[in-house]
Amino acid sequence: MLTPQPPLDMAVDKTAELGITIALAGMVAVALILSFIDWFRTGRPLVLSLMVSGGAIMVFEPMVDTVGGCWFPSNSWTAFTAWGRPLPVWLCLAYFVYFGIATSAIWKALRRGLTQRQVWLVFCAAMLGDLIFETVLLTMNPYVYYGYQPLVLGKFPLWWMAVNAAIPLVLAALIYRFDSYFRGWRTLAVIPLALTTSAAVNAAVGWPSWLVINTDVRWVLTQVGGLATFAVACVVVKLVAESVGIPNARGEPLPRATQQVRA
């Protein structure tokens, strides 16, 4: 038998699931309205495309859940099943909310101008948002993390927030960097870009934790795997900050060019 095994007999409380679904559906509805307003004001459907992209990223959830040790009960209101794993409706809504809204907000912030330090603050804010969101959800037990999870706080393995925060940051940075390309019908290219970015960042940042989650090693090595995920995430954020962040704080004059002095 393969190890670790998900808790196949786990069941979700239907009242809690209903509340979660309604709350997230309301957030998605508001976000969609705002995305259409943004389209009307700017003439660009990019925010709407990012909302769609956020939901599309959901297709990778069964894969990352398999290697990352996450399970959703089979009695959930299931949107679809893949890799033998049921994916609930509320999770699809959560993808629209977290990845769609977060990427849009970061992209707009980059267009206004972010210093490299502020890029780091955005990453930390995204991690904090994921931590709060999942900590609240896990009190209602609509899903569970299993296996040899590193860096567990309560019911939440902290390494997940590094991955989940890096995805919208990298995606927003790519769109900002090549903003002139995503015009007209080419705005639709945001969707495959989002899918590719999600897959790449999940693998690039999450692999150290994936290894220890699915391997019975010593506790210390398990925690090292989680810390390694944070280390890789920091490298990714540093690259993003240096690529799209403003080196100097707004309003701070750039240093004058040095003049050559003749001997």
Regions found by a protein language model. Name each.
Residues 1-263:
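Aromatic-rich, lipid-facing transmembrane alpha helices and their immediate juxtamembrane interface loops
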